[in-house]
Amino acid sequence: KHQFRREAVRMAQQFDYPKTETELRKLQDKLYQHSKKVYDEGGRPALKGLLEIMSAEATIITAIHNIKSNHGSETPGVDSKTMRDYLQHSHSWVIRDIQSAFKHFEPQKIRRVYIDKPGKAEKRPLGIPTIRDRIVQECMRIVLEPIFEAQFFAHSYGFRPMRDAPMALERAKLLVHHTGYHWIVEGDISKCFDRIDHAILLKRLYHMGIRDRRVLQIIKAMLKTGVMDECEVNEEGTPQGGLISPLLANVYLDIMDEWITKQWEIKKTEYPFSKPYRKYKGLRRTALIPGFLVRYADDFIIITDTRAHAEDWKKRLQIFLHSKMKLTLSPEKTLTTDIRKKYIKFLGYEYKVVPGKARKGYIPRTIPERDRLRRKTDKIAHDIKKIPHYYSREQMVDAINRINSQIRGIIQYYQCCTWVNISMKKYSRRLQFVARRRLTQYKGKWIPANQTQNLPRVHQQYKQKIPSMKYRDIYIGFTVLSFCKWEKTIPKKEEETPYTEAGRQLFFERTKKKRIHARLDEMYSEKSARATRYGQWGKLNNFEFIMNRAYALNRDKLKCRVCGGWLISSMPWAHRVNPNLPLNKVNRVNNLISLHKKCLDAVNNPNYGISEFDAKAQKKIIGYREKLVPSHTRNK
């Protein structure tokens, strides 16, 4: 252990702070690989010098971009500021402000709001930090996540990258199928996030490799942050709403994961086994109690072989949580269930096994959780009825698209259920008739789905009639809840992670989604960067412009949008297509294009001769010139 610790500290001291997003991503990979190597060899990493990485300019820009992409970025904290306020400051001011926050971190109080809990009278408290504190938290998450991802239990799925709820359900089904165990402990921790002990959490962070005491002090200050109009100091819990809170909750619950899995699933044996099933076969000859864990945030199940063992797990877990983590199991919601006789509820799904042609004699049956599905369809029916009667046909088309998005969202979440189509049919007809009545004033009709013009990928597969309205000689229809089929979930591969090249390739093979390219800040000259950082080109060249011009260059694939030539040999220039837009829109990526200097001059100067350009480029130049009217603004 001492050898691992010395090696880890030396490794940490070799890390240089990143100067670009490309370097930041490489550094994340290094942090993951180092932590994984030490962990797999039986130790724990011991990393220092993390604050310099968190407060680096490249990390701050990435953090702001991540937050800006979420709808919550326009939700103000106690200081009434939103992300828009930061984006409109100069680049240098934003960087200095966040770096200053890291050096002298004093978090502002949290603004508390309460949201409805589905199907419950009580409300869920959400703590909203200020934008400044959110940026600091996101900078920390970017650096800490790869360190913890290398050490987390392989089958915890909540709040982790490249993982989702269907994977957790699929893991449970596979365990039952392979082991033949049918007794489930349905775990429910009472107010888990509100009762996390700060001292235990900080010790766990230190244990998992965070040896930079400055970082631990900042996290401690975050945890202790008071709530406006409620308390000066928060003595326990992580604020639900903080960007780093889900990661910290996983760190805390990893204590439970480690305790459960070391008793059976990853128990060390005197002699190594070449295959896991041989190890479990040997363990079954001992007095140990079998148990396999699947966890998603604070929802978890333990799969075991008999009722007595299930009750034993429940009893011992209650003692462990109380004594080691200061948490308690909810006695009403923590159940032991034989899934051959009764459904369990897990992550919004219901799961049991029924007799069938399988090696162990049972096959899985999964359905959407009935109460939750009913509430969701009730809400959609209510939303359809509430569509204003004064809506024009254009507005009604937008309303139909919004409702269809809600319906397809429900289908997407539940299509991993084997009986999804049967379950959806029970609620589908009601929504159809509600939708048809709402279209009466637009002379709505029942039209075959494959004859409507919206959602073609879905509707072209079905001839069933759906409520539709005519709009400009085409039919737009409300989609149907039963337009769904079971889709098998691909089991999670432990090697799939955002922090290795092989892991990213596995993610692409599973989802066909490519990783977004890193910002190309290094493509802009240092002279240009200095001028824009210190606001020498006016208020339009604010932080948002500096950040988004690099993302626009990515979108343009390093090619000039006028002549199509490569922008590698010379510095690219960012041009605002419409410089007359308001400040909150003028620097968005969709209003920025990348050009050669010569092409930029041709666009901005109406007297510039364009005969040297080919016909296609000339047409583009003329088009961009027209959008500059009434002002010709030179943008760099």
Features from the language model and the residues they span:
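Duplex nucleic acid-engaging cores and interfaces of nucleic-acid transaction enzymes
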Residues: 126-141, 149-152, 156, 165-166, ...
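Polybasic, low-complexity binding patches
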Residues: 567, 583-590, 601-636
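Reverse-transcriptase-like RNA-dependent polymerase core
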Residues: 67, 97-121, 131, 135-143, ...
